[in-house]
């Protein structure tokens, strides 16, 4: 409460509301399952479902640790320091064990979500690196600074808005081939040659679509050497994105999408001969020539989105899902093993899905760890972050005093 200074001595002071924000230390609680009655008798409540037998760590605690690492990019050693400041002594090995155990228990749910995503007829794909500590006896191939360079291959279903991270030790074409061996539909990529090999060996099952964000990036990189020509090209690409903005704002139907994108197709049909003519006037090593060459080689793939209303103009959504990995690896640096990298890929899949669907990842994980062991495979889709609804547990929100009062009450008998 604050007081305004009166204008004169006869004026009554007037109160006005004021507020300030404070930060309270985090708290941890211990759930007691045994209570003593007034007569000294001990009563033990029925044991609730637990995420891991013989573990004193509750679901909310391990969910907090996992979320802190994969959403907030806090390595476990830093979390140990933070817990210590709050008076909670934990070891880094304990936290790492929890993370691995959580990942292992989520494997059935991850495989179910992966199967659902790969069953769609339109996917986007991209990849990013992860450093992995080598196993004993590994050769020096693909090694740098004593670590192995592994890859997260990421597949996203725009229809479901679900991403899947898949860890592979390399970046060869055999990696996406193994994952996409049963996929049939449109695969949108940045033009990496491994995906061309996947489509070529798929017997017509896979059609490739291009990404205008990657094509635009090539021209941005050439802007310094040919600013005037690049400015014209970037303005033209900007018109394509302006049309997409109109589509999103209108919530356009598939028919309207095709009608609006027909304007984009007209612009592109006019642009191609101009790009081809400009290409002939540029030296081979000029960045602008390389940008035009990249675009023309993928022209049909870049046009495909104008013919299919369900396709997106670029791969930006999957890049947004991947971006937290880049921040995370700057903090925790590497995975401890290939097995750990697989677990990390699974957890990033769920954390990314929670972010996309505005789900609190800590609440989701704590709830799923309890529900998953008793769930049937047919119920797994209900636990995906995209479909999840929070479970209200029987004792949630009831204080310890409630139970004590209830237990201390005198029992009634039939005679009474």
What are these regions (language model features)?
Residues 1-35:
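Short, conserved DNA-binding cores of transcription-related domains
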Residues 5, 30-416:
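Catalytic center-proximal scaffold of phosphoryl-transfer enzymes
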């Amino acid at each position: 409460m604050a007081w305004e200074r009166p204008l004169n001595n006869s004026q009554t002071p007037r109160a006005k509301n004021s507020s300030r924000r404070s930060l309270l230390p985090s708290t941890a609680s211990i759930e007691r399952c045994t209570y003593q009655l007034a007569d000294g008798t001990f009563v033990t409540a029925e044991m609730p479902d637990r995420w891991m037998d013989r573990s004193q760590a509750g679901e909310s605690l391990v969910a907090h640790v996992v979320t802190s690492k994969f959403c907030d990019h806090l390595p476990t050693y830093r979390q140990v320091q933070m817990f210590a400041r709050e008076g909670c002594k934990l070891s880094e090995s304990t936290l790492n064990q929890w993370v691995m155990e959580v990942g292992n228990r989520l494997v059935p749910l991850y495989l179910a979500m992966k199967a659902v995503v790969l069953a769609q007829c339109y996917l986007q794909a991209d990849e990013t690196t992860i450093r992995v500590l080598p196993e004993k006896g590994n050769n020096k191939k693909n090694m740098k600074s004593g670590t192995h360079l592994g890859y997260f291959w990421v597949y996203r279903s725009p229809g479901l808005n679900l991403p899947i991270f898949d860890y592979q030790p390399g970046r060869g074409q055999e990696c996406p081939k193994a994952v996409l061996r049963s996929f049939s539909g449109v695969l949108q990529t940045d033009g990496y040659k491994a995906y061309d090999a996947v489509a070529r060996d798929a017997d017509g099952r896979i059609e490739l679509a291009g990404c205008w964000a990657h094509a635009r990036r090539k021209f941005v990189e050439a802007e310094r050497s040919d600013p005037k020509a690049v400015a014209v090209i970037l303005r033209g690409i900007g018109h394509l994105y302006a049309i997409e903005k109109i589509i999103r704002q209108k919530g356009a139907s598939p028919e309207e999408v095709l009608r609006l994108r027909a304007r984009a197709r007209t612009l592109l049909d006019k642009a191609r001969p101009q790009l081809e003519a400009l290409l002939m006037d540029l030296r081979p090593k000029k960045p602008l020539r390389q940008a035009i060459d990249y675009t023309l080689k993928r022209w049909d793939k870049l046009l495909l989105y104008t013919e299919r209303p369900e396709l997106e103009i670029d791969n930006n959504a999957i890049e947004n899902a991947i971006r937290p990995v880049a921040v995370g690896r700057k903090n925790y640096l590497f995975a401890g093993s290939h097995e750990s990298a697989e677990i990390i890929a699974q957890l990033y899949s769920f954390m990314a899905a929670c972010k996309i669907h505005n789900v609190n990842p800590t609440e989701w994980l704590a709830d799923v760890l309890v529900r998953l062991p008793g769930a049937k495979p047919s119920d797994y889709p209900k636990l995906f972050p995209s479909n999840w609804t929070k479970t209200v547990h029987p004792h949630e929100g009831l204080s310890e005093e409630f139970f004590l009062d209830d237990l201390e009450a005198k029992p009634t008998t039939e005679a009474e």
